[in-house]
UniProtKB/Swiss-Prot annotation:
Family according to the record: Belongs to the NAD-dependent glycerol-3-phosphate dehydrogenase family.
EC number: 1.1.1.94
EC top class, as a word: oxidoreductase
One Pfam family this sequence matches: NAD_Gly3P_dh_N
HAMAP family: NAD_Glyc3P_dehydrog
Binding site for sn-glycerol 3-phosphate: K105, G141, S143, K196, D249, S259, R260, N261
The protein's name in its UniProt record: Glycerol-3-phosphate dehydrogenase [NAD(P)+]
NCBIfam families for this protein: PRK00094.1-2 (NF000940), PRK00094.1-4 (NF000942)
Family annotation (InterPro entries): 6-PGluconate_DH-like_C_sf, 6PGD_dom2, G3P_DH_NAD-dep, G3P_DH_NAD-dep_C, G3P_DH_NAD-dep_N, NAD(P)-bd_dom_sf
Length: 336
C-alpha cells in the first residue's frame, strides 16, 4: 500500500508514523511544506518542533517540494493541514484517482466582508464544491497526536459516503495500537469534530476559574446537547454523537491537558488576551477559528447554542471570563 500524508504538523506526522510502523512493505511518504523542517526531520530522525523525543520509523520517507509523482502513485492521500489550507489542496487533488481523506476539524472561516447570511462550510461541503468527483472522507475521533506517535491505544472513526475511502483508511491505520471504525455519517462526524473544539474552550475557562468538576460536567453534557441539535439540523444521525467523534472526542478535548482548545480557555481565565493565548500555543487551536462560523451556521438553522454563543462573545472581547460564566448561569430555567 502506498500512503501519502500532506503536512508535517503534529497530527500528520503522528499518523504517518503509525502507518509506517506496520512493517508490511508499505510505502509511507510525509510531505513537509518547509524545506528546512523536512531536512531537519531526515537528519535528526524526529519532528523536533511538534513531537520532540519521538523517533520516526526508518520506513517513513520525509519529502519536500515536488509531490505530484508521489500523489500519482498513491493508494491513499491524507491531508494533514489546518482547515484554512484544505480548499487549496482539494482543488489540487480533484482529479486524482486515489481516495483522499482529511484530518482537520472545523468549519471554513467566513471571508472578511461577507454578507450576514454567509456561513462557513464543513470540509465535506468544501470538497463537494471544489472537487465533486473526488472519493473523499475524514479520519476523526478522540486522539492526541503525541499518544498516537508513541503507539498508545487509540480508536478513530473513518467517515465517508464512499465505502472505498473507509476501506482504505481502515487498511492504512487499523493495527495493534489503533482501531479504526467505519461510519457513513460524515455530517455527524464532522459536526462533532468542529463543535467539540469550541466547547473545549468553555471547559478550559471553567477549569481556569476553578469552578469545579460539577460545572465541567454540566458544560460537557449541555455542550453535547448543542452539538447534537446542530448535527440533526444538518442531517446527521443521533447515534453518531454518542460515538467516538461526538462524545468521545468531546470528553477528551474538554478534559485533556494536551488539548490546545482547552488551553485557550485556561489562558483566558488567567487574564491573557486572545492574541496572547494563541501566540503561546505555538500550534493551531481550531476552536478559535471555528467558533464564529459554527454559531453563524446555527443561527441560519435557528438552532440554539448558548455555550457556543458565549464562547464567541468571549473571543470577541464582549465578555470577560467571569462574565461569561455568569451569562450562562443567568439563563432562564427550562426542561432538559
Amino acid at each position: 500500500m502506498n500512503i501519502v500524508v500532506i503536512g508535517a504538523g503534529a497530527w500528520g506526522t503522528a499518523l504517518a508514523m503509525s502507518a509506517a510502523a506496520r512493517g508490511d512493505g508499505r510505502v509511507v511518504t510525509l510531505w513537509a511544506r518547509d524545506a528546512a523542517q523536512a531536512q531537519a526531520m531526515r537528519d535528526s530522525g524526529e519532528n523536533a518542533r511538534y513531537l520532540p523525543g519521538v523517533a520516526l520509523p526508518a520506513a517513513l520517507q520525509v519529502v519536500h517540494g515536488e509531490i505530484d509523482g508521489h500523489l500519482a502513485a498513491a493508494d491513499l492521500i491524507v491531508i494533514g493541514t489546518p482547515m484554512a489550507a484544505l480548499r487549496e489542496w482539494l482543488g489540487r487533488l480533484q482529479h486524482v484517482p486515489a481516495p483522499v481523506a482529511w484530518l482537520c476539524k472545523g468549519f471554513e472561516a467566513v471571508p472578511a466582508g461577507a454578507s450576514a447570511a454567509a456561513h462557513g462550510l464543513m470540509a465535506h461541503e468544501v470538497c463537494a464544491e471544489v472537487a465533486p468527483d473526488l472519493l473523499c472522507g475524514v479520519l476523526s475521533g478522540p486522539s492526541f497526536a503525541a499518544e498516537v506517535a508513541r503507539h498508545q491505544p487509540t480508536a478513530l472513526v473513518a467517515a465517508s459516503r464512499h465505502a472505498e475511502v473507509n476501506d482504505a483508511l481502515v487498511a492504512a491505520f487499523h493495527g495493534d495500537a489503533m482501531r479504526v471504525y467505519a461510519n457513513a455519517d460524515i455530517v455527524g462526524v464532522e459536526v462533532g469534530g468542529a463543535v467539540k473544539n469550541v466547547l473545549a474552550i468553555a471547559t478550559g475557562l471553567c477549569d481556569g476559574l476553578q469552578l469545579g468538576l460539577n460545572a465541567r460536567a454540566a458544560l460537557i453534557t449541555r455542550g453535547l446537547a448543542e452539538m447534537t441539535r446542530l448535527g440533526l439540523a444538518l442531517g446527521a444521525r443521533t447515534e453518531t454523537f454518542m460515538g467516538l467523534s461526538g462524545l468521545g472526542d468531546l470528553v477528551l478535548t474538554a478534559t485533556g491537558d494536551l488539548s490546545r482548545n482547552r488551553k485557550v480557555g485556561l489562558l483566558l481565565a488567567q487574564g491573557r488576551t486572545l492574541e496572547q493565548a494563541v501566540a503561546s500555543l505555538g500550534h493551531v487551536a481550531e476552536g478559535v477559528y471555528s467558533a464564529r462560523t459554527v454559531l453563524a451556521r446555527a443561527r441560519l438553522l435557528n438552532v440554539e447554542m448558548p455555550i457556543t454563543e458565549t464562547v464567541v462573545e468571549l473571543l470577541d472581547g464582549r465578555l470577560q471570563a467571569a462574565e461569561a460564566v455568569q451569562h450562562l448561569m443567568a439563563r432562564d430555567p427550562r426542561g432538559e
